[in-house]
């Protein structure tokens, strides 16, 4: 495992826009999905703000760095430095807020490895309630649960602000 020494997050995953094309960014988060296409590996990186696609290219990275990218698995915690580039028209994903861009990795650090989780960290899964409660720390990473917590925060803040004005 590695450290963040000398690297600091410049953006959250869900905040990178097409206007950032050409900029070098550093993002950190959990590996959500990984797809291996031979000399290319695509990883959806997730943090509290959303998802962004990371591209690992064997030709551009070098063999040792690409081998590290091949070892990535679901829920690994990683830090990535790379250049934002616009996706080609046929690869744009309208279902993602960051679907028009991707980050071409120039540096990868694996901050923490993870065992296979007992359930996938995504919405619309039929997972037993007791299993979700047992692994509450994983359940709280799901987007649906994060939305619920943010809603509760906003309601409580509105109430506090109201009573502060009284």
Residue ranges and their predicted role:
Residues 1-166:
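Class II aminoacyl-tRNA synthetase catalytic cores and aaRS-like
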């Amino acid at each position: 495992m590695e450290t963040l020494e000398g690297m600091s997050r410049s953006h959250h995953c869900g905040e990178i826009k097409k206007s950032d094309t050409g900029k070098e960014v550093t993002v950190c988060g959990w590996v959500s999905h990984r797809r291996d296409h031979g000399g290319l590996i695509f990883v959806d990186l997730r943090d509290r703000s959303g998802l962004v696609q990371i591209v690992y290219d064997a030709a551009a990275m070098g063999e040792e760095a690409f081998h590290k990218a091949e070892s990535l698995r679901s829920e690994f915690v990683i830090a990535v430095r790379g250049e934002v580039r616009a996706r080609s028209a046929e690869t744009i994903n309208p279902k993602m807020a960051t679907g028009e861009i991707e980050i071409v990795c120039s540096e990868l650090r694996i901050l923490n490895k993870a065992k296979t989780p007992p359930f996938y960290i995504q919405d619309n899964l039929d997972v037993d309630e007791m299993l979700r409660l047992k692994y509450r720390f994983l359940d709280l990473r799901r987007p649906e649960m994060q939305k619920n917590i943010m809603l509760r925060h906003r309601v409580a803040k509105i109430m506090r602000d109201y009573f502060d004005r009284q």
